Amino acid sequence: MQATRSIGIVVTAGAVALATAGVVPAGDGKEQIKFNPADQAAARAVVIRRADLGSSGWTGGPTKPDLSSGPRCANYHPKVSDLVLTGAARTTFQNAGFAFDSQSSVLKTKRMVALDWRRSVLAPGAVTCLRHTIGKGLGSNAKVVSFRKLSFPQLATYAALFRGVISVSSQGTTVRVLTDLVLVGRSRTELTLTIVGPVSAKSALSAAERRLARSLIARARA
């Protein structure tokens, strides 16, 4: 899915926000973009809303979807030029060291989603390329400790979890930040959730991302 299409990494005050969009990386160029009103509305229905986060203190909201090309590595360059993107939406929220980013993509056909998943998420080079790209984007005060693909509940036709642990040093203190990339897809809809927070909150973050993935993909109209 546009699982790794765009990865932007920001390190601030010991928190790492890794923003992704959709569920497919770059490969042989870009997918074709042919937005239509119905699929744009369907994409907006799937992303995180403030009410989905429950507690107060969250700031953020809708932002421009990232449609740029994703990482390219020698052993990882999935074909995307035959995919047609008909809808996209994105929201980002932050709260005291936590960052939640969601981006949805609607493709023209179900078959395109299946191709997208097989080429990018299931590709043997995905983990290695993602880790390399993340590490390259971090500043000198941060480094990737680990990055791997983990099991995730089959909440939809397609579901996967990539988890990174990043060490961040600031003012003589080093903290470890968890960065989870959750990818789910159903019918023509793809959703990427990026959840960032302290490693000490791993259990709470895992529960939150499963709850969100389940409720958001249930809102898919396309």
Question: Where are the regions that the model predicts?
Answer:
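Short, well-ordered beta-strand elements
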Residues: F100-S104, D180-L181, R186-G197
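Secretory targeting and sorting signals
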Residues: M1-G27
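Short Gly/Thr-rich strand-loop-strand
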Residues: G60-S68, P124-D180, A218, A222
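A short acidic-to-branched-hydrophobic micro-motif
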Residues: V84-L122
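Second-shell loop/turn segments in exported
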Residues: K34-D39, A99-K108, V196-S203
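N-terminal "mature-domain start" segment
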Residues: G27-A89, H132-T133, L138-G139
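Surface-exposed amphipathic alpha-helical segments
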Residues: L193-A222
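A short, structured loop/turn motif at beta-sheet edges
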Residues: L107-M112, K149-A159, G185-T189
